[in-house]
UniProtKB/Swiss-Prot annotation:
Interacts with doxa-1. Residues 28-298 form the Protein kinase domain. It is found in: Cytoplasm, Cell cortex; Cytoplasm. ATP binds at I34, G35, C36, G37, N38, F39, G40, E41, L42, K57. The gene is csnk-1. Residues 386-394 are annotated as: Putative palmitoylation signal. GO terms for cellular component: aster; cell cortex; cytoplasm; nucleus; plasma membrane. This is Casein kinase I gamma. Involved in the asymmetric cell division of the embryo downstream of par-2 and par-3 by regulating the asymmetric cortical distribution of pkk-1, a phosphatidylinositol 4,5-bisphosphate-producing enzyme, which in turn regulates the asymmetrical distribution of grp-1, grp-2 and lin-5. Prevents expulsion of the entire meiotic spindle into a polar body by negatively regulating the Rho GTPase signaling pathway. Involved in regulation of reactive oxygen species (ROS) levels. It comes from Caenorhabditis elegans.
Length: 407
């Protein structure tokens, strides 16, 4: 990892240079805003040493719930490994703390939209195999992730060697499950407030139980079924308050049998969810068993892990836009006719995370997706439009009454 901690000196800390350009550290130029959230904003940046674009996460120093420094510490703990974004710098930037990171490509949620909200068995199996290894690595560093959702898994930038690698980003909700002082597993507790994304979080999380490694795996299983079905049975539930909605989501998860959730799909998906839900709080998961479940799905399909995902031909068929940046750069970053940089929603998701909602029970963070509960369920947004303070895009309307037909 090439990250460095910025000092408080005038020479190394972020300043406005003689040309009036805002800088982070000695060589990172701060550009336009491409994303925002409750705890700060995301800026496009540029490394003036090599002209590569970066993502710069900014958090006010006076934030009431600072998390950027903790996220930076977790990235240092994780180090350099496949599927983790490279961190270049952490330090002050005026009234902000700044985290400078590798700019990645599209999120799985963006790619899901690109594929008309349907992934094939082959694609989901390959995604599952990568993400199980990714979560396994995080767990080996004594961290639990606690923020599984499609927006937090990104491919590398287009036309680079990382374009088929799924990266795990946004460790603002991660937690050490091994006590640093004692070297022992954290204690089992109940009556915890919700932390994570309601759509994907485990049943035990809804029940207020302390999270451990098992909960990351169960949340992955819910996300895999989301990709296969197109939606989950607990999406689009209405309630007067967020607390009541989370309660309804949890109740529906408990009432939906695994066999019903996974009906029409290979039994390995049901086996995986049953396994994750039966794990003990302290238990080390058998990651190889989980990985091989999805490898067997590929084997029965007569397929190999060839990195040919459903989105691959769709991205390959995207023509290079007029006036775009150098062809080796991501198609996320483009130039308008005026020469201004324009970044897609995928790039804005990268390394940033989503809007957070504080649960009134205890003040821990409940992670919501960018739009509503996890996301507005397909087909129940009457306007068909997704909005936030930075983006507006049109979405096709879909029916979510039945799972997508697997071909």
């Amino acid at each position: 990892m090439t990250n460095t901690r910025g000092s408080n000196s005038a020479t190394s800390a972020s300043t406005t240079n003689s040309q009036g350009v805002l800088m982070v550290g000695p060589n990172f130029k701060v550009g336009k805003k491409i994303g925002c959230g409750n705890f700060g904003e995301l800026r496009l940046g540029k490394n003036l040493y090599n002209n590569e674009h970066v993502a710069i996460k900014l958090e006010p120093m006076k934030s009431k719930a600072p998390q950027l420094h903790l996220e930076y510490r977790f990235y240092k703990l994780l180090g350099q490994a496949e599927g983790l974004p490279q961190v270049h710098y952490f330090g002050p930037c005026g009234k902000y703390n700044a985290l400078v990171m590798e700019l990645l490509g599209h999120s799985l949620e963006d790619l899901f939209d690109l594929c008309d909200r349907h992934f094939s068995l082959k694609t989901v199996a390959m995604v599952a195999m990568q993400l199980i290894r990714r979560i396994e690595y995080v767990h080996t560093k004594h961290l639990i992730y606690r923020d599984v959702k499609p927006e937090n898994f990104l491919i590398g930038r287009y036309s680079t060697r990382k374009q088929h690698v799924l990266h795990i980003i946004d460790f603002g909700l991660a937690k050490e499950y091994i006590d640093c002082d004692t070297g022992k597993h954290i204690a089992y507790r109940e009556h915890k407030s919700l932390t994570g994304t309601a759509r994907y979080m485990s049943i035990n999380t809804h029940l207020g139980k302390e999270q451990s490694r098992r909960d990351d795996l169960e949340a992955l299983g819910h996300m895999f079924m989301y990709f296969l079905r197109g939606s989950l049975p607990w999406q689009g539930l209405k309630a007067d308050t967020l607390k009541e909605r989370y309660q309804k989501i949890g109740d529906t998860k408990r009432q939906t049998a695994v066999e019903v959730l996974c009906e029409g799909f290979p039994d390995e998906f049901a086996q995986y969810l049953r396994y994750a839900r039966r794990l003990d709080f302290f238990e080390t998961p058998d990651y190889d068993f989980c990985y091989n479940l999805f490898k067997s799905v590929l084997d029965r399909l007569g397929a190999t892990y060839d990195y040919e995902f459903d989105w691959t031909p769709k991205l390959n068929n995207v023509s290079t836009p007029s006036g775009s940046l150098h062809t080796s750069e991501s198609k996320d970053v483009k130039r308008t006719d005026r020469g201004e940089l324009k970044v897609s929603q995928a790039a804005a998701h990268a390394q940033f995370g989503s809007t957070q909602v504080i649960n009134s029970n205890a003040g821990e963070v409940v992670e919501e997706s960018r739009n509503t509960e996890g996301r507005t369920a397909a087909g129940d947004n009457s306007s068909g439009e997704v909005k936030c303070c930075c983006f507006r895009r049109r979405r096709r309307k879909h029916n979510n009454a039945t799972p997508a037909t697997q071909k």
